[in-house]
């Protein structure tokens, strides 16, 4: 005789929808668990008698019920819906911008991150490419579904994807750092000090900690949260009615400012936030909520960025044009991209990097000399780079094994109530501090070797960096 008990966990904050299934067959208990909509992981344990098997199964069920799980019917909850940003991109009538190089990723691209070493692009097919500043491909990953955005948090680079996972790209295998509930139609993500902010189609905004546990969630009267930005001051949420700021600790609303059009993109600098809107403007606000300069464009704004401290403000519209303004709101120039409308953009060292509806990562020279030459009709010869053949990336749960930790740091997995936690066992670290570590590769009593362990910015937990291997006995 077989007995099946099926449970689900559905946190109100919408960040954890998981299942737990216990199947008892004679003397065997099989436990399967994971995210709703996925196959999950399974464990099987044999017992000396059917009675002992039933008692073990009942104990496991009680543990889950006490931690928030509830009885449910399998299959009633649907997999996540996905909203992909759509721009009906028109050709620009402005002069061509001075493009230095453009990389054809192969599919519409939403994710971009630029630093002194690398230029990263993530596209609709889940392909991520890292280029140097001359446009040469240095690295690539292939993720299961489309990339919504690329987000940096200190030295960590993350990819938020349509499958609801946020992947850490610091090692050679992308690892799942956060798993967002299937009923959340994700619009945008941001991360600061290991805390993930999520905004969605329904106007909700939530903050999730480094253990993938909800800190708080706010249901608003708005919708279409295309902007969420994390800062020391709070979480800034841009939506159908403007921009709202929430307190980091408990999600208390600090201020709200209305915009005439819906917010379609957001940016922040040290003391300001910027919202590109459907009414062809960029609204700026101080981080204390005071309205500041409004930047007027000719079409709906789907991306924006600034030079250091807002000295210049850049914008991209749905007519394949980019704009530049000074701090006072004066338009300095408007030029065509030549490669579609910008879904996202970043500025660095007199260059604007855009990712577009045509799937390009384009590097545009916005120095005064280059812009003046472009306005006069003189353009550089743009280097055109095609994407290399896509290389398969191992699944996020793939683990190499080693019997020698070498210079790595050893971690151990242990049970803490209903949760599996991690601690550092290598001498010299605080063994009582928790560790941010992928949930879907944790196995009780297992040991792992990681390239590096670094303290979080606030010093209250550790974060892994680089490659992860399973430590085994020789």
Annotate each PLM feature.
Residues 97-104, 136-141, 173-180, 213-219, ...:
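A short beta-strand motif characteristic of beta-propeller blades
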Residues 456-474:
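OB-fold/S1-family single-stranded nucleic acid-binding modules
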